[in-house]
Design a protein with these regions (language model features):
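Extracellular beta-strand ligand-recognition surfaces/modules
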Residues: 33-37, 165-199, 273
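Extra-cytoplasmic beta-strand recognition segments
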Residues: 52-54, 94-130, 166-172, 198-203, ...
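Extracellular glycan-recognition surfaces and repeat-rich motifs
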Residues: 53-84
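Extracellular carbohydrate recognition and processing domains
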Residues: 141-176
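Aromatic-lined substrate-binding rim segments of carbohydrate-active enzymes
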Residues: 338-402, 406-409, 440-459, 496-498
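Active-site clefts of carbohydrate-active enzymes
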Residues: 394-397, 507-540
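Carbohydrate-binding surface patches
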Residues: 607-646, 672, 677
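C-terminal beta-strand-rich structural cap/linker in extracellular carbohydrate-active enzymes
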Residues: 659-678
Length: 678
């Protein structure tokens, strides 16, 4: 086996940034623009662009199956409204729909007013409500696109006899038509009555271009590396048309974008909070198209045991060595599950994610702080790291804790938690968001800033399950996590014909969101919780393939979802856990390649038939490795050409070398292979 000449990657943050972005022009006053000559970033007025009071009935609404009826005197002020009513389960969402023209580049706020009289369903006992769904349309056909939706559920098991407002922020991605299909609904698993009235959509703010500071480990300012901004410019525009005006600590500089980033050095500042303001300027159009106000922290960071430094490429350096977290969501604990940490470690995982108040492994102590500390140290006995979930510590979350151990106030409790564990050597970081709606992002960003101000040694991770929210969430953590659970979804059910194509589509997009990527692959099935619908658990091959898909796209950590779903809600526990364990051990064994800075030849994929095949080559200590995945469903075939890399062997028997450096892969449904030496 042989590979072509390889070279080491960038050795420092400063070198990396110097290679990817430059500052232009110098900060002399005469080179700075007169912002009064630029049109400010503006949105439409705050007046609703759509309003429906149903006083005129269902005019203009499509009512499939006559799901809703009009009530002319049951609305908010004794006027019109609509009603969905169901006494027996019929397996369908009750909906009405209407197309509404909007605009790209604006964040909108949908407001829906409702009241309910719910009945308990003896079959499902479903406790969530969902009153609306925004469906995006194909720009060519104006037809709906499967999975191109925006909706929100809320834990609401009981009736809401009084009129209640539900507000939801959204925007229309530029890849879709600017017209949306608004759907009002009663969830398929709820019985009773739902009244809806006064539905409006209003502009909340202009989105403009996305920009935020990046490559600052734990929000710490590095004077040698300078300040780097990520920018997502408007479609069909050239970077050369734009300049970024950055003000940091009273110093202003104009920066030139290059490959989606702009970097400049600003010198040294006194310790404390460094306030930043960046203004993205359209130079030919003389317009402001984006503004960001952020902070970094100026400080000397003590080098404590377990410190994690986030490299510019997203790699974690822990105690001076590259580190790949391979963890599992631990969920809640059952008292009878006394072997949990040992089981997780034996399965090949090196860390766990868990809400801080759920981490009880040595019994409850006199204080919550003592309980948490004892549990984190118990994890350390099993050589397990801890990703501490503080995601509930925002005002909008019902599970937030505002009083503990005599400490009062939401932020004070958060400080108390972080101060208790931030010096623990096995702490991995903090989990600050979990599939939140974008309306909660200001609170999540505040939580991230508070966390990083208190703990300069460990990163924050923020998660969304929606690819159209990547750009919004990317600045709310050091890492952007994505979870996707394609196996056994409602449309594939228990069929062997599974596909991870939608997961693949989203993962491709996350690379362009500006933050390093953490992958949350599936090891469970939601239907096990319901215990009515067919349950289709991921096979060993499917789990392996989903995990390897993340490796192709530079996942910097893996957190499998989820332990509690397998052990507390499922059947066939041993088989499911074995499938998860095989994948965890595999990805850990590949970490020297996944974390390597050695350059590798490009793996060129020629699709021959079937679902999409992806591949990537890695090199560690001169030894090549190739990872291949197939989206599924059905049979597929592809030719993977890896220039100069010959003699690789298939680990799973799906691939053969047909000529020097050319490999033929054949897969079935969700599939994968790993090519390496003997």
């Amino acid at each position: 086996m042989k590979i072509p000449h390889s070279k080491a990657g960038f050795g420092s943050m400063a070198a990396f940034l110097a290679a990817c972005a430059i500052a232009w022009p110098p900060a002399d006053g005469e080179d700075l623009p007169d912002l009064s000559q630029f049109k400010p970033l503006k949105t439409d007025s705050g007046e609703p662009v759509f309003f429906e009071d149903f006083n005129e009935g269902l005019n203009g609404w499509t009512n499939p199956g006559n799901s809703f009826t009009w009530r002319n005197q049951e609305g908010m002020v004794g006027t019109g409204c609509v009603l969905a009513e169901r006494d027996t389960y019929d397996g369908r969402d009750l909906t009405i729909q209407k197309k509404i023209p909007l605009k790209h580049g604006i964040r909108y706020r949908l407001r829906v007013h409702y009241r309910t009289e719910m009945k308990e369903d003896p079959l499902y006992k479903w406790k969530k409500q969902e009153y609306f769904c925004i469906r995006y349309l194909d720009p060519a056909t104006e037809k709906t696109i499967y999975a191109a939706v925006d909706s929100e559920t809320r834990h609401e098991p009981d009736s809401k006899p009084d009129w209640t407002e539900w507000s939801h922020d959204f925007y229309v991605p530029e890849i879709y038509s600017s017209t949306i299909l608004l759907e009002l609904r009663m969830h398929s698993k709820r019985l009773g009555k739902v009244w809806i009235d006064d539905v409006s959509i209003e502009p909340a703010e202009a989105i403009g271009a996305t920009l935020f500071p990046v490559r600052n480990s734990e929000m710490t300012y590095d004077p040698e590396a300078g300040i780097t901004y990520f920018m997502k410019l408007p479609l069909n525009r050239q970077e050369s048309d734009f300049r970024l005006l950055v003000e940091a600590g009273g110093i202003k500089k104009m920066l030139e974008p290059k490959n989606g980033y702009a970097n400049g050095t600003f010198g040294r500042f006194p310790d404390g909070t460094l306030h930043l303001k960046a203004t993205l300027l359209d130079m030919p159009g003389k317009a402001v198209i984006g503004v960001d106000e952020s902070v970094l922290y100026v400080r000397d960071v003590e080098n404590i045991p377990g410190r994690i430094v986030v490299e510019p490429d997203g790699r974690m350096i822990r105690d001076g060595k590259p580190f790949l977290p391979v963890g599992v969501y631990a969920g809640y604990n059952r008292p009878s599950d006394t072997n949990k940490l040992q089981r997780i470690r034996d399965a090949g995982f090196n860390c766990v994610e868990q809400v801080w108040s759920h981490a009880v492994y040595t019994g409850k102590k006199n204080t919550a702080k003592e309980t948490l500390l004892a549990s984190v140290r118990e994890m350390a006995k099993y050589d397990l790291g801890f990703l501490c979930a503080i995601k509930h510590q925002i005002p909008q979350c019902k599970a937030k804790i505002e009083s503990v151990d005599g400490v009062e106030g939401l932020d004070n409790v958060t400080r108390y938690i972080i101060d208790a564990i931030k010096r623990e050597p096995n702490l991995i970081g903090y989990y600050v968001a979990d599939e939140n709606p974008i309306i909660q992002l200001p609170a999540i960003r505040h939580l991230r800033r508070l966390t990083s101000e208190l703990d300069p040694w460990h990163p924050t991770m923020t998660l969304t399950c929606r690819d159209d929210h990547f750009l919004f969430f990317a600045d709310s953590g050091d890492y952007l996590m994505f979870d996707s659970y394609p196996v056994g979804y409602f449309y594939t059910k228990d069929s062997p014909r599974q596909s991870m194509a939608l997961s693949h589509k989203s993962i491709k997009m996350i690379r362009d969101a500006g933050a390093p990527f953490v992958w949350v692959p599936q090891i469970f099935n939601w239907n096990a919780e319901i215990k009515i619908l067919p349950v289709r658990y991921p096979t060993a091959k499917e789990v392996r393939s989903m995990v390897l898909l993340g490796a192709i796209y530079d996942a910097r950590a893996y957190f499998f979802y989820a332990y509690h779903c397998i052990f507390y809600q499922s059947e066939n526990v041993d088989e499911q856990w074995a499938n998860a364990s095989q994948a965890a051990r595999l990805i850990s064994s590949l970490s020297p390649w996944l974390l390597s800075c050695e350059s590798a030849p490009k793996a060129e994929v020629k699709q021959i038939s079937g679902a999409e095949v992806a591949a990537r080559a890695f090199v560690h200590e001169g030894k090549p490795l190739v990872i291949i995945t197939a989206d599924g469903p059905d049979e597929c075939e592809a030719e993977i050409r890896v220039p100069g890399v010959t003699g690789l062997k298939s680990r799973y028997g799906n691939t053969e070398e047909v000529s020097p450096g050319v490999y033929r892969f054949k897969g079935l449904h969700i599939d994968s292979d790993v090519l390496g030496g003997e």
